[in-house]
């Protein structure tokens, strides 16, 4: 690739600085394509998740414990898109870090915190959907706004504490000081943690994922049983009361929400599993993964932050209506917050 450039064969991130990292640039064509692909992901993550947050906060019909969790998840994904992805894009394509050591630590801390915050949010959302579908009568009293607030707080505090410990205490580098020193160069920003913290990171992914798989498996079984009961009830009693009809519609909506969020969980697993496996392999096999494979795995997790709004837009009619009202400027008009987003 260096044959396409007039510079010396060996390029450095900082040509006139001792201890500079070696630069491995892409040729112009792939470079432009990568900037477009990564940039599109960042824009989608920022704009899409911002629309989710605005929708939930503005429209009163969406003010529910479950939707507050979704808005908080979107906030985490929004922060990934605006504070992590643009700088990671430059690092991935230029193979150099040009933003200083202090910001490297902050960027890495935000990267880990916001991404794992998304994981915990999805786990709590699965708990919410499980209660809503399996025990709908007591759901309003079990999963209240205060309970949702506690879940949101945990989803933010734990990842922030963990990532701060990793990047600001030095404890994660204990036992691998020689490796950290060998990889340290001017213009680099590489996350290197010891095996103990790699295992902790794996558990932060594995335990919530296992909880989600178990709960959504139960949700789909119960939802299938409920669908059969409702179909039998409706066919056997054409003259059902409006109250019973309303309950059936609400139950159907809850099941659809559970299925939609189930798709979100599947997308999350597809995005995160390669990176998690790669991190484990590297930690115990001596960083054998090629750089380009590692970058693909990393950007898989980043792109997960951009996928959720697309899933909502595809499956949630209320989100489509909210987007139309926001983009058309209708939300600036009086009483727009009381718009009916669930009308048939």
From Swiss-Prot:
Specifically expressed in neurons of the olfactory epithelium. The gene is Taar8a. Residues 53-67, 133-146, 217-260, 304-344 are cytoplasmic. Its main location: membrane. This is Trace amine-associated receptor 8a. It comes from Mus musculus (Mouse). The keyword GTP-binding does not apply. Glycans are attached at residues 4, 18. Gene3D superfamilies: Rhodopsin 7-helix transmembrane proteins (1.20.1070.10).
């Amino acid at each position: 690739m260096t044959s396409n450039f007039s510079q010396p064969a060996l390029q450095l991130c900082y040509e006139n600085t001792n201890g500079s990292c070696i630069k491995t640039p892409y040729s112009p064509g792939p470079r432009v394509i990568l900037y477009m692909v990564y940039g599109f992901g960042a824009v989608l993550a920022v704009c899409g998740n911002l629309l989710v947050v605005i929708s939930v906060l503005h429209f009163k019909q969406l003010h529910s414990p479950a939707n507050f969790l979704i808005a908080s998840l979107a906030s985490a994904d929004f922060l990934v898109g605006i504070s992590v992805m643009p700088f990671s894009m430059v690092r991935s394509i230029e193979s150099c870090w040009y933003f200083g050591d202090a910001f490297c630590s902050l960027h890495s801390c935000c990267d880990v915190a916001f991404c794992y915050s998304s994981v915990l949010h999805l786990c709590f959302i699965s708990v919410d959907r499980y209660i809503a579908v399996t025990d709908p009568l007591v759901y309003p009293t079990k999963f209240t706004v205060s309970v949702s607030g506690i879940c949101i707080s945990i989803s933010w505090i734990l990842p922030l504490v963990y990532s701060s410990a990793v990047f600001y205490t030095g404890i994660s580098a204990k036992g691998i000081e020689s490796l950290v020193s060998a990889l340290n160069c001017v213009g680099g920003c590489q996350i290197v943690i010891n095996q103990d913290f790699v295992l902790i990171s794996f558990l932060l992914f594995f335990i919530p994922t296992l909880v989600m798989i178990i709960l959504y498996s139960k949700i789909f079984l119960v939802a299938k049983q409920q669908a059969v009961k409702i179909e039998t009830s409706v066919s056997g009693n054409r003259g059902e009361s409006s109250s019973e009809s309303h309950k059936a519609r609400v139950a159907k909506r809850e099941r659809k929400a559970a299925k939609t969020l189930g798709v979100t969980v599947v997308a999350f697993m597809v995005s995160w599993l390669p990176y998690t496996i790669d991190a484990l392999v590297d930690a115990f096999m001596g960083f054998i993964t090629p750089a380009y494979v590692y970058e693909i795995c990393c950007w898989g997790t980043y792109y997960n932050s951009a996928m959720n709004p697309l899933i909502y837009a595809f499956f949630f009619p209320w989100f489509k209506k909210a987007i139309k009202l926001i983009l058309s400027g209708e939300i600036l008009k009086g009483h727009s917050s009381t718009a009916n987003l669930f009308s048939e």
